[in-house]
A protein has these predicted regions:
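Short S/T/G/P-rich N-terminal loop/turn motif that feeds into the first structured element of a domain
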Residues: 1-52, 58-68, 79-97
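Long, charge-enriched, surface-exposed interaction segments in small proteins/subunits
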Residues: 71-72
Length: 97
């Protein structure tokens, strides 16, 4: 079983009236993320006015590269939704320790 990847889980609360605009942005995020070599999986879930993004990367460096890659898209998303929580999960020790 593989357990040395790093996963990122941001949660957003959508501003009133912005649900369709937020959902329309999802393909842009997915397309941009598809170019990242360290990405393992990536996707969005919507529950009412809340968004959850489930994503994972080969390493912490992959997470940082992803954040650089989607920075402009994320800035736009934050005009339509508030970031309410972020979870980052990874191995206890790096594979080189």
């Amino acid at each position: 079983m593989r357990s040395n990847f790093v996963s990122l889980h941001p949660y957003f609360k959508i501003h009133p009236g912005k649900l369709e605009a937020v959902k329309a942005a999802f393909p842009c995020f997915v397309e941009k993320t598809a170019t990242e070599k360290d990405n393992l999986f990536y996707g969005f879930s919507v529950n009412g006015d809340e968004i959850f993004c489930r994503e994972a990367y080969e390493s912490a460096e992959g997470v940082l590269a992803h954040l650089d890659n989607i920075g402009a898209l994320l800035a736009e998303m934050l005009t339509m939704a508030n970031l309410v929580r972020v979870e980052l999960h990874g191995p206890w020790k790096s594979s080189t320790n």
